């Protein structure tokens, strides 16, 4: 086995490095043990691709910064457009919902109380007028009574009559 090692070294030294080294396969006649030859980096050559020397390193950095700046400006413009559209949409919605926001239930309650009082007075005055006419002997149809002004209470009266 030791006699084989110098032969391998002489074989490596006799062959010049090529792109495809000629390796002879081991045959079974040489011995029962198979030996593998290892190749050193000096004997094999790889594709000799080199990175070109960048003479203008600042130009590459400048191009990269320019592209980054353009992308940033486009991104900011898109963000501003989306922000403005959102503000306009919210403003439009606010104007549509403004009557709901300005609703004050206390003011509405005061108006309803006034109408109820007026309606009660009108009903009391109609009953008083009807009883006065009955005592005087004049009969009038309900349709001939004093005209009532229409109010929102008509709807509440109908609702109260339904629930009663």
Curated annotation (Swiss-Prot):
Protein name: Uncharacterized protein C3orf18 homolog
Keyword Mitochondrion recorded: no
Cellular localisation: Membrane
Keyword Transmembrane: yes
Topology term for the membrane: Single-pass membrane protein
Record-annotated membrane-spanning stretches: 64-84
Region (Disordered): 1-48
Classification lineage: Eukaryota, Metazoa, Chordata, Craniata, Vertebrata
Coiled coil: 106-130
GO CC annotation terms, alphabetical: membrane
Keywords: Coiled coil, Membrane, Transmembrane, Transmembrane helix
Primary localisation category: membrane
Biased composition (Polar residues): 1-17
Biased composition (Low complexity): 24-45
